[in-house]
Amino acid sequence: EKFNRMFPIGLSKLPGIGYILTGGISPLSKRYGLAIDNLLNVKGFFGNGDFFSLDIDNLNKKEIPIWEGIKGAAPFFSIITEVAIQTFENFPIQVFDGFVKEKELKELIGISETFPKNFSFQFIFSDNIYVYIVGELKTEEEKNLAQKYHSIFQRFPSLKNKIYRNLNQINFFPKELNIFELNANFHSEVISLLGKSLKGYESEFVEELIEINAAKPNKACYVAIQQLGDQSMFENKYSSYFIHREACWKPWIFASWEKNNNHDKKVVINWMNEAWNRLKRFFPYIHLAQLHNHLNSHQDELKLAFGSKLDELKDLKRIYDPSNILPPL
């Protein structure tokens, strides 16, 4: 704020280092890319205890595979203690948001598939559906384009329209959804998926969400989605372990239950897995934003997240975490 700069944060506002290193998808990722593609410097320790400090502009041949591994798969062979990231100048943000009906959601998904890189779409599907359309207004052309969308979105009377000074001013998802209260008596799991365009499948997708929501075991379970694409499809000078660069959508399934209630936990995890199975045809890949080495799905998730690069990751782990101190592959 002091320097009128920002970093493309996620929907939970204050990003931790885990958000950055697992990929880091923001409402502005279509313009600025993923968080891992904006890394400049990384410090930390390997699983074998050795310290490292890497700078993107001063990598030797041996360090390049390490840098690439840190971008999306760091927890398996390293502990990161410090990062330096590229920041960007702040610009006004136009937001259209509100509760919508299932039919309106289908139409909005279709409209969002044609958005330019400065606009993105995200929503949460629970007992009610709440959507966010976020647009950065950097140029006069983009301000004029925002007026065009304002006219289009007037067809959706529940959508509010507001311009914020910058992205940091926005509080995503209202308390009226009644699902975000931090409760020490509940545990949760999240599984994140990745997939290509939904063009032509908007209706089928929303119908699946309706059935998934109807089957949820409690009000704290939900499905949400973020749009990516454009700049997030491109890596910077080095590759990464976020391999599914063709992805246009990242849905996540949030599953929560009362702690120490093993029956509820089993029911909720089963619901999460069933929701995943239902959504696989639209989103066949995994964004490994949360590790599940304690769940039966861990190996499948690794394969769907890293694909053919999994063997390279195993090589990094063998070299830098030979005692398997860090999460397993």
Summary of predicted features, one role per range:
Residues 1-329:
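Soluble FAD-dependent oxygen oxidases
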